[in-house]
A protein has these predicted regions:
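Solvent-exposed beta-strand/loop surfaces of large extracellular or lumenal domains
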Residues: 5-19, 271-272, 536-555, 658-682
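Aromatic- and carboxylate-enriched substrate-binding clefts and catalytic-loop regions
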Residues: 8-10, 64, 198-453, 488-490, ...
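Accessory, solvent-exposed terminal regions and/or long lumenal/extracellular loops of proteins
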Residues: 560-665, 672-674, 678-689, 693-789
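Conserved, mostly hydrophobic/aromatic
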Residues: 35, 102, 192, 238, ...
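Catalytic core of carbohydrate-active enzymes
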Residues: 335, 340, 355-363, 377, ...
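Catalytic and substrate-binding clefts that recognize carbohydrates or anionic sugar/phosphate headgroups
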Residues: 12-166, 176-177, 182, 189-194, ...
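An acidic-aromatic substrate-binding cleft motif
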Residues: 151-179, 199, 718-728, 732
Length: 790
């Protein structure tokens, strides 16, 4: 007999029924939908290759399947952890990683065999139960062709949605395995403020509890008062700084007699305290788990602990329920407890437990080796995880530990490139093992390294409104923010070949830098899909789609490509993501007409499924006229701001002749080093439409040819040149060229003249350097520094 009880994978059994037809013949029954046709021979018993056939419907990607058919093109899912891995190779087992199969395949179909999986019972807090009929068949067959996005959304229909994390999860997390004290943590936070570096989450590793014999160990549940003499006041200090905190847990050793909460737990479990016996960790024991939450963890949550970091150290399988994965089950238990007992959104950070764990959000990928190989592998690993909806991997940015035999030096270039990539991952969190050389605090770096590292965090916060909108898409449709290229370009061979390249949401393409620089530049081969042009954000270059191209980047540049014409809502400078009323900078990228629907909600309540708001922003271009519209906000949620400050930022923009806002003439600022027009809309009610009309002249020089990068590289090279020759006096041409971007800001009315002069001077750079009378070595160095090409 078939069971309709929810399983670990399929939590929804009562599903919407698609349109279908049935042909009921004497020997067979045929069920047809728009995507497939199922044919079964009656009276033949369990499904086998002899009695069941599923074929694609007309017009669909062709396939024929019978039980036992092996997929040839599975696009893979993820793995439990990166512990001990350098790239895809484990330095301890000397085995290469074999990613689990995912939900998607180039074959166009997937079978999920759920027959052996555990079920949930129907108790008030649903609990694990084994299947009564061990030989039953519980299958889900998905036919999707190459419509991968449809497959993922369909999976959420029966397997559940990916919960929307609280907004603060998309800020910067500071984490380090280090025996921090209360005072050191305060100094750390002060330094973040001093250097104007945003911060949302502080992670405290296992030294929050006692770790020495007789007091603690890997497992611990009692605050170490040598380091934190007053935990409540420490947590209160963090709250006063709008910070969230998570504590590390290694739960495997249960509750020892030396723990503060041991007497309460012993009484709860009926253990004789006189025997001083350890209370074992058994996650399947509902009474034990209720005691752990109510007696041990809940008091700390009430003090101010926001969520828990479930680190590895529990046994692979439960001690009482045979074959029950401790990782899978502990993730469910902790997350569902937060669902049941908190007013705020549940969030957990943990290792992957298997299919169905997408319902418990944030992943902790573990202890990866510090190396370029590890950085090179992580984009592919992260992208593939979206194929099982595990779209929120949190990596130890910069790597966790050195490999035995490696020189223990923190390579600033490797860390910088990892941080730049980390800013464009689901969760931005630095971490490392307890090693005195792994000082990843940004203020330990100098010059371009500090600039690039700090800018990576600032860029992350700029992107927060876009990222949060994409997180809502993950909840609605099952599409992760970091997704392989084949989701959008399933018929392009390059979408499968360029494994590290990915879409970061709907509008942004990222081609990570995963190798060291040569002669001060990183060269990356980038595939730009056809269908639209692409704006290389960091250099201000508009590139044609439908090509594979090599591009070079300095340390402070990174290959991020925005679909031409995109409209992206961004933040300016923010302290963190605690506030819900920050001004929005609506960025308009060069290209054709574009639009974006900005999403907002309370940020941390549990009512986001129905309580939220959206604002549509769009552009219309006609010859030399640009219209930008910020539509009226639709929807509502708790504590929603009634009005908001908007600014319009037009990238690659010339100087306008006129600007109006809702028919009234308006002023503007010009940002010379970005070639960007900035228009401030007076703060108005969010439910009012705002229309900005921008009229340009008919004579506009080419602006999206990389001149922004030329400005920046030239200025940096001039600054560095002064340290090579402190007595240098710049010629008028060299001085004017270096000052172009600031001159544009000061004197935008000279726009055409300044741009034309810069381009002329830049094209004549060898002659300018001769006029400057630089020696041969400095001339060659300068040309390389600016990346000059004829």
């Amino acid at each position: 007999s078939f069971t309709d009880d929810p399983s670990f994978v399929a939590i929804h059994r009562n599903l919407p029924v698609p349109k279908y037809t049935v042909q009921n013949k004497n020997a067979t029954v045929v069920i047809s939908t728009a995507r497939m046709k199922l044919k079964y021979k009656k009276g033949q018993g369990p499904f086998t290759k002899d009695n069941l056939t599923i074929t694609s419907a007309k017009g669909m990607f062709p396939f024929q399947w019978t039980p036992g058919t092996i997929q040839k093109g599975n696009l893979k899912g993820t793995d439990r952890t990166l512990d001990g891995f350098e790239g895809d190779h484990n330095i301890y087992s000397h085995q290469d990683m074999k990613l689990e199969d995912g939900l998607l395949s180039t074959d166009g179909w997937t079978l999920i065999d759920d027959s052996k999986n555990f079920l949930f019972d129907n108790s008030e807090w649903a609990w694990v139960k084994a299947r009564e009929h061990k030989d039953g068949q519980d299958w889900y067959f998905m036919a999707y062709g190459h419509d991968y996005k449809a497959a993922l959304k369909d999976f959420t229909v029966f397997a559940g949605k990916v919960p929307l994390p609280p907004r603060y999860a998309f800020g910067y997390w500071w984490s380090r395995y280090w025996s921090y004290s209360d005072k050191e943590m305060r100094q750390l936070v002060d330094n973040f403020h001093t250097y104007n570096i945003p911060l949302d989450v502080l992670v405290v590793d296992m030294d929050w509890h006692y770790t020495d014999p007789g007091f603690g160990g890997w497992t611990g549940w009692t605050w170490n008062r040598r380091l934190f003499p007053n935990p409540a006041k420490f947590l209160g200090y963090l709250k006063s700084n709008d910070l969230k905190i998570t504590l590390n847990l290694h739960p495997a050793d249960g509750v020892a007699p030396y723990e503060e909460k041991y007497p309460e737990m012993a009484q709860w479990m009926g253990v004789d305290t006189a025997k001083q016996e350890r209370i074992p960790w058994v996650v399947s024991d509902k009474r034990f788990i209720n005691g752990m939450f109510n007696k041990v963890l809940r008091p700390m949550e009430k003090q101010g602990v926001d969520f828990w970091w479930l680190d590895w150290q529990q046994w692979m399988y439960d001690k009482k329920v045979d074959s029950l994965s401790n990782t899978w089950w502990i993730n469910y238990v902790f997350f569902s407890d937060m669902e049941r007992n908190r007013d705020t959104r549940p969030m957990l950070y943990h290792r992957w437990g298997g299919l169905g764990n997408h319902r418990y959000q944030i992943g902790f990928s573990g202890d990866a080796v510090i190396s370029w190989k590890s950085l090179e592998f992580q984009p592919y690993f992260t992208n593939c995880a979206s194929n099982v909806l595990y779209g929120y991997w949190s990596h130890d940015i910069g790597g966790h530990m050195f490999k035995g035999g490696d020189k223990e030096i923190l390579d600033p270039e490797l860390f910088t490139r990892w941080m730049q990539y980390g800013a464009l991952t689901p969760v931005m969190r630095t971490h490392s093992t307890k090693n005195s050389v792994l000082n990843k605090e940004l203020w330990n770096f100098k010059g371009d390294y500090f600039e690039a590292l700090r800018n990576s965090i600032l860029f992350r916060y700029q992107l927060a409104p876009y990222i949060y909108t994409m997180a809502r898409e993950t909840y609605d449709n099952g599409i992760s923010i970091c997704r392989p290229m084949y989701y959008d370009y399933p018929e392009a061979k390059e979408a499968y070949d360029f494994k590290s390249e990915y879409m970061f949401g709907d509008q942004i393409l990222v081609a990570p830098i995963t190798t060291p620089m040569q002669n001060g530049l990183s060269t990356v081969k980038v595939w730009l899909p056809e269908g639209n042009d692409w704006f290389e954000w960091t250099t201000g270059t508009l590139l044609k789609g439908g090509q594979i191209i090599e591009r070079s980047f300095t340390l402070t540049e990174y290959p991020v490509y925005v679909k031409a014409g995109s409209v992206l809502p961004l933040y300016n400078r923010v302290k963190n993501l605690n506030s819900n009323s920050e001004e929005i900078i609506v960025n308009i990228f060069p290209g054709e007409n574009g639009s974006f629907t900005f999403y907002e909600d309370n940020g941390n309540d549990k009512y986001y499924a129905n309580e939220y708001a959206r604002t549509r922003m769009y552009t219309e271009r006609k010859e030399n006229h640009l219209t930008v519209t910020v539509g009226p906000r639709q929807g509502k949620y708790r504590n929603m701001p009634t009005d908001r400050q908007f600014k319009i930022k037009v990238l690659g923009s010339a100087i306008p002749e006129t600007i109006t806002i809702n028919g009234n003439r308006a002023e503007y600022e010009y940002i010379g080093d970005e070639l960007a027009l900035l228009i401030t809309i007076p703060q108005t009610a969010c439910d009012q439409e705002k229309t900005i009309e921008i009229q340009y002249s008919t004579s506009i020089p080419e602006l999206n040819d990389g001149i922004v990068s030329q400005f920046k590289r030239f200025s940096k090279a001039i600054t560095a040149l002064k340290y090579r020759d402190a007595g240098i006096v710049l010629t008028p041409a060299m001085g004017a060229t270096e000052a172009t971007s600031i001159a544009l800001t000061y004197s935008p009315e000279r726009f055409n003249e300044l741009i034309e002069t810069f381009k002329r001077n830049y094209s004549q750079m060898p002659e300018m350097l001769k006029e400057q009378k630089l020696n041969e070595a400095n001339s060659q160095w300068f040309m390389k520094a600016i990346g000059w090409k004829k």
